[in-house]
Amino acid sequence: MNRSMIALCVVLMVSLVSAQVFDLDGQQLAGLEQNDARLMEQQVKRSPSAKWMRFGKRSPSAKWMRFGKRSPSAKWMRFGKRSGAEAVSEQDY
């Protein structure tokens, strides 16, 4: 009887210790995810024009204006669709 009680206590203590270790891992993971979110926010703050300037390219709107063409969004609006990206996602395969 005493051995079974001791074994039960040991099993309970081991399970509690393992639960705490897993909880610490979860807290560390949450901390890493918060750090990743902060890094992503810093990258998102860059304006689209800064991205195009960084690569030495014209912005997409300037490209369409330069050649006197309609922009892709204007083309889709002419045919009654909301945008090119949504039209692609609505296609049946």
UniProtKB/Swiss-Prot annotation:
Propeptide span(s): 20-46, 83-93
Modified residues (Phenylalanine amide): F55, F67, F79
UniProt keywords, alphabetically: Amidation, Cleavage on pair of basic residues, Neuropeptide, Repeat, Secreted, Signal
Gene Ontology annotations for the cellular component aspect, listed alphabetically: extracellular region
Broad class of where this protein is predominantly found: secreted
Keyword Secreted: yes
One Gene Ontology biological process: neuropeptide signaling pathway
Gene Ontology terms for molecular function: neuropeptide receptor binding
Signal peptide extent: 1-19
Statement: the UniProt record of this protein carries the keyword Glycosyltransferase: no
Subcellular location: Secreted
UniProt record similarity statement: Belongs to the FARP (FMRFamide related peptide) family.
Function field: FMRFamides and FMRFamide-like peptides are neuropeptides.
Name of the protein this chain belongs to: FMRFamide-like neuropeptides 22
Name of the coding gene: flp-22
